Amino acid sequence: MGDPRISHIELDEATIIWRNADIEQERRIAIFDLIEENTFKPLRAFEAGHEGPYRLKLSVEDGRLALTVSDDDGNGGGQLLETVILGLGRFRRPIREYFAICDSYYQAIRKATATEIETIDMARRGVHNEAAEMLLERLQGKIDTDFATARRLFTLICVLHIRG
């Protein structure tokens, strides 16, 4: 019986140029939530008999997102199965918007009213949801996943794009 899920996720540390405490917290939460509950089935690997769980490494190479998928052998490693490459051009606007809204959100938490924070958070969720839908479209035919997993993956894609 297969177990089509991510059991381990890694971000290419060389890709991450800058972090702050707020973004680091977002990263930790996204990884924790992703490992706790996700649906992730790389179609080529699954059809070849590799039914999960999977290890996933996210990196940016030549301006493109690389999702490197390996079997999880239970010992911290596994066989490389495939690397799915996605162009990031369509994600630039949502990433930029997400960062701008997150910046406003983090500032608002410190000094705004509950209503103002809620308004900013709704905008943040809207951009996040739109980007997750876009990611689902881009993964179609390559990796089967669900909306919640795509949402958390988008958070991690954003972490890879932080510039100080």
From Swiss-Prot:
Pfam families: UPF0262 (PF06793). InterPro entries: UCP032146. Belongs to the UPF0262 family. HAMAP family: UPF0262. This is UPF0262 protein Saro_0143.
